[in-house]
Structures are given as C-alpha cells and as structure tokens.
C-alpha cells in the first residue's frame, strides 16, 4: 500500500477545487432556473441575435449610423446630431444660465 503524502499544497488544491465546483454548480442551477422561468412567462421569447461581423444589432437588423440620427433640442429648437448632443446640451444650457 502506498500512501499519498498529504501536503499543504495538496490540501489547498482540494479546497480550491471544491469551492470552484460548488460555485459553478450554483451558477448553473440559478441560470437554469431563470431560463425555465423566462420560458414559462414568455413562451415566444427569442434570444438575441449575434453577428460576428458586427454589422447587425441584437435584433438582427442593420445598425444605423449615429450621425444619421437627429434629436430635437427642446431648449433652442434645433435638430442636433446624436453624436454631438452632449456637447450641444452643455453649450445650450449654459447659455441660458448666463441670461
């Protein structure tokens, strides 16, 4: 009979493996329960679309360029490009405070 020498390293590896296994099992159980609940509540639920090229959004539709979207500023009444909205609002709202 050969006995395995018990070292601190082997004990710590065993504890780590037990902790990781327990954590993984807990996460899998929670996610499985959540998926079953979602399928029960929303039977027609579709999962998000994944496009490896990055040209489609999560619904499988063509992405719109941010510069093609315009937002109406209620403060000054101008249409501002979506990618410039934050800078516009900062300028637009600070002008109103000076008056």
UniProtKB/Swiss-Prot annotation:
InterPro entries: SAGA_su_Sgf11, Sgf11_N. It holds the Pfam family Sgf11_N. Zn(2+) binds at residues 73, 76, 88, 92. A zinc finger (SGF11-type) spans 71-92. Keywords: Activator, Chromatin regulator, Metal-binding, Nucleus, Transcription, Transcription regulation, Zinc, Zinc-finger. Changing residue 85 to D: Strongly reduces deubiquitination activity of the SAGA DUB module. It is found in: Nucleus. Component of the 1.8 MDa SAGA (Spt-Ada-Gcn5 acetyltransferase) complex, which is composed of 19 subunits TRA1, SPT7, TAF5, NGG1/ADA3, SGF73, SPT20/ADA5, SPT8, TAF12, TAF6, HFI1/ADA1, UBP8, GCN5, ADA2, SPT3, SGF29, TAF10, TAF9, SGF11 and SUS1. The long N-terminal helix forms part of the 'assembly lobe' of the SAGA deubiquitination module. The C-terminal SGF11-type zinc-finger domain together with the C-terminal catalytic domain of UBP8 forms the 'catalytic lobe' of the SAGA deubiquitination module. HAMAP family: Sgf11. This is SAGA complex subunit SGF11. It comes from Saccharomyces cerevisiae (strain ATCC 204508 / S288c). The gene is SGF11.
